[in-house]
Amino acid sequence: MRFIWLAIIGYLFGSIPWGYIIPKLRGIDIRKVGSGNVGGTNVLRNLGGFWGAITMVLDGFKPFIPIMIAKHTFGVSVSDAMMIGFFAGVGHCYPIWLKFKGGKSVAVSVGTISGTKASLVPVFFAVWLPIVLITQYVSLGSILSLAVITILYFLTDSWQTGIWMLALFLLTTYRHRGNIVRLIRGEERKTDLIAAFTKRNKNKKEG
């Protein structure tokens, strides 16, 4: 019964579509611009770094908040907390409010790491940031960073926690399957982070 409740809580928090809500408040349906993905990277590319960052932070809080409540109120284990994060990832990728068409769970993964093993967050960005700045491939940086973090969970925590992190990593990788194909073909879209955080948003509000 506890498993069911934790899964439901994680899923419902994860289903909050900030990647849709934030652009919509500015008159933009993010599903109709750029890649059409309801995620922080697409928001960043089309609305600029500020709104992209806001979206990513809010997405990160989706697993972080229920994990913190569960840990400090009910004393759940780290593996149970990680399970909440995994189902938040499922909710983010397949939100009930948007006909199960959501994002790719990178920010949710970072939020889960923050809530279960915060010491690994700097490691994530230490891998992610150089890759993205050098290659300009957000997808490549995200997948490789989460791969490193998954290995570290197995090395520094229980195997149960590692399994849930592996499940979250596989979910995120699966959601990036199109990106992986484009990376192999040399067709993946590049994202200049510096430009994204300095350019003015050129999108006009939709009627």
Swiss-Prot record:
<keyword id="KW-0444">Lipid biosynthesis</keyword>
<comment type="pathway">
    <text>Lipid metabolism; phospholipid metabolism.</text>
</comment>
<keyword id="KW-1208">Phospholipid metabolism</keyword>
<keyword id="KW-0812">Transmembrane</keyword>
<protein>
    <recommendedName>
        <fullName>Glycerol-3-phosphate acyltransferase</fullName>
        <ecNumber>2.3.1.275</ecNumber>
    </recommendedName>
</protein>
<dbReference type="GO" id="GO:0005886">
    <property type="term" value="C:plasma membrane"/>
</dbReference>
<feature type="transmembrane region" description="Helical">
    <location>
        <begin position="3"/>
        <end position="23"/>
    </location>
</feature>
<keyword id="KW-0997">Cell inner membrane</keyword>
<feature type="transmembrane region" description="Helical">
    <location>
        <begin position="120"/>
        <end position="140"/>
    </location>
</feature>
<dbReference type="GO" id="GO:0043772">
    <property type="term" value="F:acyl-phosphate glycerol-3-phosphate acyltransferase activity"/>
</dbReference>
<comment type="similarity">
    <text>Belongs to the PlsY family.</text>
</comment>
<keyword id="KW-0443">Lipid metabolism</keyword>
<keyword id="KW-0472">Membrane</keyword>
<feature type="transmembrane region" description="Helical">
    <location>
        <begin position="151"/>
        <end position="171"/>
    </location>
</feature>
<keyword id="KW-0808">Transferase</keyword>
<feature type="transmembrane region" description="Helical">
    <location>
        <begin position="50"/>
        <end position="70"/>
    </location>
</feature>
<dbReference type="InterPro" id="IPR003811">
    <property type="entry name" value="G3P_acylTferase_PlsY"/>
</dbReference>
<keyword id="KW-1003">Cell membrane</keyword>
<dbReference type="Pfam" id="PF02660">
    <property type="entry name" value="G3P_acyltransf"/>
</dbReference>
<keyword id="KW-1133">Transmembrane helix</keyword>
<feature type="transmembrane region" description="Helical">
    <location>
        <begin position="78"/>
        <end position="98"/>
    </location>
</feature>
<comment type="function">
    <text>Catalyzes the transfer of an acyl group from acyl-phosphate (acyl-PO(4)) to glycerol-3-phosphate (G3P) to form lysophosphatidic acid (LPA). This enzyme utilizes acyl-phosphate as fatty acyl donor, but not acyl-CoA or acyl-ACP.</text>
</comment>
<comment type="subunit">
    <text>Probably interacts with PlsX.</text>
</comment>
<keyword id="KW-0594">Phospholipid biosynthesis</keyword>
<dbReference type="GO" id="GO:0008654">
    <property type="term" value="P:phospholipid biosynthetic process"/>
</dbReference>
